[in-house]
Amino acid sequence: MSKNRNIIEGRILSFDKSPFNKDFDFSSLNVDKKRIFIIDGIIDSIEPVNFIHPEFQDIEVIDYGDHLISAGFVDAHVHYPQTAIIASWGKRLIDWLNIYTFPEEMRFKSLNYASEVAARYIDFYLSNGTTTMASYCTIHQESVDAFFEYAAY
């Protein structure tokens, strides 16, 4: 079976050591220009630009020039039903919930509305480099169905 192969070239954001250990000062950040060799959507290797990979002889290089390439961002706590009320003002939390949040979340019992917002929300996150999120839906099954249907798309 033929494998899908890609080569991406650009400035790769990486670390010499884990940035999560207590010796972070000794973990230097690199943005060197390199090539990423990908087989069936999985990174096979990251190599210097002059490296010739034997399995990628006839593959065109997608060169992003000096643009930065990094792993996707992770958002560990987001609420997709609040997309339409981002930056809505509230004097106190309970005011904000009663005036904006609860009425907006009730709209998610409509599958059409939930689907429209799910598409806008997921597209927005992906366009800004967020590839992983832990997102809340509403109490309505339609909000969950719309979210996961679009995410699977």
Regions found by a protein language model. Give the residues of each.
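N-terminal metal-binding scaffold of metallo-dependent hydrolase/deaminase domains
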Residues: 1-56
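Flexible loop residues that form catalytic
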Residues: 15-16, 79, 138
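Low-complexity, flexible helical/coil segments
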Residues: 45-48, 72-79, 106-116
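Alpha-helical scaffold segments that flank or form the walls of functional sites
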Residues: 87-153
